[in-house]
Curated annotation (Swiss-Prot):
It holds the Pfam family ubiquitin. Residues 1-63 form the Ubiquitin-like domain. There is a cross-link at K37 (Glycyl lysine isopeptide (Lys-Gly) (interchain with G-Cter in ubiquitin)). InterPro entries: Ubiquitin-like_dom (IPR000626), Ubiquitin-like_domsf (IPR029071), Ubiquitin_CS (IPR019954), Ubiquitin_dom (IPR019956), Ubiquitin_ubiquitin-like (IPR050158). This is Ubiquitin. Ubiquitin exists either covalently attached to another protein, or free (unanchored). When covalently bound, it is conjugated to target proteins via an isopeptide bond either as a monomer (monoubiquitin), a polymer linked via different Lys residues of the ubiquitin (polyubiquitin chains) or a linear polymer linked via the initiator Met of the ubiquitin (linear polyubiquitin chains). The keyword Disulfide bond does not apply.
Amino acid sequence: TITLEVEPSDTIENVKAKIQDKEGIPPDQQRLIFAGKQLEDGRTLSDYNIQKESTLHLVLRLR
């Protein structure tokens, strides 16, 4: 599990960048899933109604 400090206004792209900083996984290999939906880079956490303490799933796209 990776814990991140984020704001509701953060974009998915931004969250992926934070994951890269912590784990070294390039954003283009990350797919974030919440409530069964793949999250789009340009949207924000609040667009998806992702709240405090929510858990996202990270799926890696392998080359």
